[in-house]
Swiss-Prot record:
UniProt protein name: Large ribosomal subunit protein uL22c
Oligomer status and interactors: Part of the 50S ribosomal subunit.
Annotated function: This protein binds specifically to 23S rRNA.
PROSITE patterns in alphabetical order: RIBOSOMAL_L22
GO terms (BP aspect): translation
Protein species of origin: Nasturtium officinale (Watercress)
Length: 160
């Protein structure tokens, strides 16, 4: 059996909440509202939504941001929720006592929630570098990101 290994990502951080006492369907309803949004916007949305499932998801997003700032040194203003998924967990089965010695089964569903935050400043720096390479007079050989055009005084031609 071949297992897919996770690639090491230098721009993303995740937080995983397991066995959260809520149905996966209700959690997905909240997760769909925050997927693709920035960290601060997602926190605002989660605080104002009137669902019971918002609080555990709020704690997960907050925990993922704490992981990002502590472990990788990312700024919270540059974080975006790139991936948010909800998987169904175990179903806890209980018995509710009823009249005449009978009992009714109660099924308590759980879910596993994964929140992945990504730092967008890395992509902005990459786009700036690509825009720099498209400028006339700049070539890919200049690794130190300094551009010398032919009309400027000094530069490479003054050195002998």
């Amino acid at each position: 059996m071949i297992k897919n290994r996770k690639k090491k990502s230098y721009t993303s951080v995740y937080a995983l909440g397991q066995y959260i006492s809520m149905s996966a369907h209700k959690a997905r309803r909240v997760i769909d509202q925050i997927r693709g949004r920035s960290y601060e916007e997602a926190l605002m949305i989660l605080e104002l939504m009137p669902y019971r499932g918002c609080y555990p998801i709020f704690k997960l997003v907050y925990s993922a941001a704490a992981n990002a700032s502590h472990n990788k040194g990312f700024k919270e203003t540059n974080l975006v929720i790139s991936k948010a998924e909800v998987n169904q967990g175990n179903t806890v089965k209980k018995l509710k006592p009823r009249a005449r010695g009978r009992s009714y089964p109660i099924k308590r569903s759980t879910c596993h929630i994964t929140i992945v935050l990504e730092d967008i400043s890395f992509y902005q720096q990459y786009e700036e570098y690509l825009m720099y390479l498209k400028k006339p007079g700049c070539s890919n050989e200049n690794r130190n990101l300094t551009c010398h055009d032919t009309y400027s005084s000094g530069g490479l031609w003054d050195k002998k």
